[in-house]
Amino acid sequence: MKQLAFVFFLATALVATPSLGQSLSTAGYEFVDAVKKSDGNKAIEVLSTHPPGLVDTKDGDGNTGLIIAISRSDEQWTGFLLNKGADPNLAGKGGDTPLIAAARVGFESAIEWLIGGGAKVNGTNRMGETPLIVAVQQRNLPIVRILLNQGADPDRADHAAGYSARDYAQRDARARDILKLIEDKKPKGAAAAAK
């Protein structure tokens, strides 16, 4: 009988009290909304009164504040979110990582910041695209150079067409400079094998 009374008490207490997840959901919505509206005061207010993981909250489309800021090439917000501990590898809509999102919009400074913050240069989205594949498709030579210098694999194929960054560059007559850069860059394993 005591056990039944305890279960009843516990059930009543749980129904009457909003869960931690519910309160974080509201705060998460407020935070992402502040990022979308570029409302720095609101973002700081919400972050200062909630757990640090809130910075990685996703919106209804599945994008984090970091990906939202990167998508609009917003240096101030991207830097702010990275300084607040945003995960540089947390994928958003379509599985795009922040690094893929930055390559897609040609946001060069974000590429450097993300890599400096531990972003995986060979991370993929749901279609198997890497940041390097996206940069090649965008014909963005400076970003291709940065990614290759940071160890991006030009021979990793995507799932969509089965092509690698090298393959895409070979197939695009307007990407000859990019192809040359890829061809001139020795794979990481080649230097070790030569020793």
Stretches with model-predicted labels:
Residues G53-V55, P88, V121, P154:
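Ankyrin-repeat inter-repeat connecting loop/turn
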Residues A27, G62, G95, G128, ...:
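Start-of-repeat signature of ankyrin repeats
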Residues D39-S48, D74-L82, F107-I115, N140-L148, ...:
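Ankyrin repeat structural motif
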Residues I70-G79, N83-K84, L90-G118, N122:
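Alpha-helical adaptor scaffolds
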Residues G21-D33, Q150, A160-A161, D167-K195:
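Ankyrin-repeat-protein effector appendages
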Residues D33-D39, I68-D74, A101-F107, V134-N140, ...:
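Ankyrin repeat A-helix N-terminal signature
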Residues A5-A16:
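Bacterial N-terminal signal peptides
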